[in-house]
């Protein structure tokens, strides 16, 4: 099945500490034919300054098509900022590309974005959630992001993940816990509405 990557962007993108950020790493190992980039206002400003994200993608995969969603979101730490726009954006991609599998980057963006996208990946047909741990296997907090003044071409030249034999860090986490709680809540709602037969059918 053909693939499309839906990816928010964060401080680890496109490269951090001489290794791929999550977006680039998924692109490298899953080779989707198209990438849909979701920008907050902060990431949009960085892209407009030097096109760091799109340049890095074109450098790694010259034939990969790029779509961009500029959300204008400033308060990226608020769930309500993403609760509507992210599901709508993913659904739009699914509707426009019914023959494609949608890969969802669960490792870039704010914790709020990651949670919303993980729930979507768990509960949406033809969607696959992918995580990319840091190369050290630890939190990225101690590794400062590259300065905005550093040319992305220089970062790409010293990218360890571009070397032959570099480790594939992509993981497909079990998201059944999200699906379990969603189904549980549906069953409870049906019981409260006295729809016992429907609740029993769903439980089975």
Describe these PLM feature segments.
Residues 1-103, 112-204:
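Long, low-complexity, Lys/Arg-enriched
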